[in-house]
Design a protein with these regions (language model features):
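N-terminal module of bacterial RNA polymerase sigma factors
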Residues: 1-23, 30, 109-113, 118, ...
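Structural recognition of an alpha-helix C-terminal capping motif at a helix-to-coil junction
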Residues: 40-47, 60-72
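Conserved RNAP core-binding helix
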Residues: 17, 25, 35-52
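Internal acidic/polar
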Residues: 84-115, 137
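Arg/Lys-rich amphipathic alpha helix in sigma70-family domain 2
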Residues: 55-57, 68-89, 106, 158, ...
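A short pre-motif secondary-structure segment
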Residues: 127-131
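DNA-recognition helix of helix-turn-helix
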Residues: 71, 145-169
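Sigma70-family region 2
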Residues: 6, 46-61, 81
Length: 175
């Protein structure tokens, strides 16, 4: 390969990592619940991106394409023998360094919500993570998961139905 083309490809990868690296890491972390594994998976995601960059046709948004790779890599990890344990909800969100009571209560609420989300079936958990935490639209979530928009809407609706009584029971309300 021409060294100039290789530099261009590396520059594109660097720009993608700069813009989306943290977002991909967060999504993967939310899916697998282990910081070290999430970092490894994120690295694998960007290796795949580098290898596939020339084949990206632009039929979907670059963020959707990246998230699809991240979701697939995370699913592969969760199916593997490397992942055979339950993780605590406290590992889902970064721990706050402050000790203000209000922030502690807010953190506890986030952890409880995260624990409830992680208790959902995988199909519902994925759409919640991509739609709410990942900030993808219905269309982008459908593309990332390789399902129809209707399936995403149905899964979101059913996930909310399952979460509502759990949130009320935990005293976290429902808006």
């Amino acid at each position: 390969m021409d060294s100039r083309l290789e530099q261009t490809k590396e520059a594109k990868l660097s720009a993608l990592m700069q813009e989306y690296g943290t977002k991909v890491l967060r999504l993967v972390y939310l899916m697998v619940g282990d910081r070290s594994a999430a970092e490894d998976i994120t690295q694998d995601v960007f290796v795949k991106v580098y290898r596939s960059l020339d084949g990206f046709r632009g039929e979907s948004a670059i963020q959707t394409w990246l998230y699809k790779i991240a979701v697939n890599e995370s699913k592969g990890y969760l199916r593997s023998w490397a992942f055979r344990r339950v993780f605590p909800a406290s590992r889902i969100f970064r721990q706050s360094q402050t000790t203000v009571e209000a922030e502690a209560l807010e953190k506890l609420g986030r952890e409880n919500v995260a624990q409830l989300v992680m208790s959902l079936p995988a199909a519902y958990r994925e759409v919640i993570l991509l739609y709410y935490y990942g900030g993808l639209s219905i269309v982008e979530t459908a593309e990332a998961l390789g399902v129809s928009e209707g399936a995403v809407r149905t899964r979101l609706h059913r996930a909310r139905q399952q979460l509502k009584p759990l949130l009320i029971e935990e005293g976290l309300g429902w808006t």
